[in-house]
Amino acid sequence: MDEELQAIRQARLAQLQAEHGSAPSNIASGPSSNQQQQEVQDEMRQNLLSQILEHPARDRLRRIALVRKDRAEAVEELLLRMAKTGQISHKISEPELIELLEKISGEVSKRNETKIVINRRVQDDEDDWDL
């Protein structure tokens, strides 16, 4: 699967470079080339996600990105890392995506957990103002 995925990546990269009229080079020529590289990387990322996720799961991830971009990016990174290491053998369905989201949200809530401590005054039996 890695060889097939790599071939798809190379073909898509060649196609995008042909569209932009640029040859592959390691020399950056200003912010426009950085922007083009970012666009190419985003395109490759979206292609990989479309290969990993079923359509309903992809739609759910897009809706989540509208509300919580950080969570959506964390899930995308996790999915891409799992795909690169060969942990994904089939397309991820929507219920499986929900499980991943719950896992990530549980980790985030543990990190961001705040405790409120209320120190109540101890009732003092001895008054200084005995009149």
From Swiss-Prot:
This is Uncharacterized protein C23C4.09c. Residues 15-43 are annotated as: Disordered. It holds the Pfam family dsDNA_bind. InterPro entries: PDCD5-like, PDCD5-like_sf. GO terms for biological process: chaperone-mediated protein folding. GO terms for molecular function: DNA binding. GO terms for cellular component: cytosol; nucleus. SUPFAM superfamilies: Double-stranded DNA-binding domain (SSF46950). It comes from Schizosaccharomyces pombe (strain 972 / ATCC 24843). Residues 23-34 have a biased composition (Polar residues). The lineage of its organism: Eukaryota, Fungi, Dikarya, Ascomycota, Taphrinomycotina. Belongs to the PDCD5 family. Transmembrane segments: none annotated.
